[in-house]
Amino acid sequence: MPAITGLGHVALKVKDVERSLAFYRDVMQFPEMMRLHHDDGSLFLIYLRITDTQYLELFPDGVDDTAPGPDHTGMHHFCLTIDVIEQTVDQIVARGGIPCAWTTENGTSALRPVDKPVITDGLDGNRQSWLQDPDGNRIELMEMAPDCLQMQAIRKLKDM
């Protein structure tokens, strides 16, 4: 039986495709691979490379100003795994990325911009830091620890 081999891409509907392209290409360092167009020549999507097997698609002409809040149904965030969190976060901020941190006010969680990067230990045992793209999509940067809950679960699954 064929198996799923990975997550191919994340697709985002964005309000200003050039602003989002600048963020993901210049700040996050995802090179543009190609553009697809409708028959009338208008832009359908921009395809960016995260890794050789993982991509980001930017679809233009989003109608709302920002992504839905973290309590809304739908995508909460997407996570990018990294090797060295301090160095990577510092490089992203140096290229114009805005560091963010989770706060709670009146029982409502929100990811808000902060002056300097915040690196925390997640409940799963991994180190994490957060930022938002120009449309408010939440991005987690995660350095996976050798004994994190995910790695423990992988070892258990392999032993079955």
Walk through the language-model features, giving the residues of each.
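Residues that flank catalytic or metal-binding motifs in active/ligand-binding sites
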Residues: 6, 44, 52-54, 74-76, ...
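Conserved catalytic-core motifs of GNAT/GCN5-like acyltransferases
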Residues: 31-39, 102-104, 126, 143-148
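Core segments of cupin and vicinal oxygen chelate
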Residues: 2, 13-56, 94
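Short, charged/polar surface micro-motifs in flexible loops or helix N-caps
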Residues: 51-55, 63, 83-87
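Vicinal oxygen chelate
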Residues: 14-18, 71-135, 146, 157
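Acidic/histidine-enriched, glycine/proline-rich intrinsically disordered or flexible terminal extensions
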Residues: 142-160
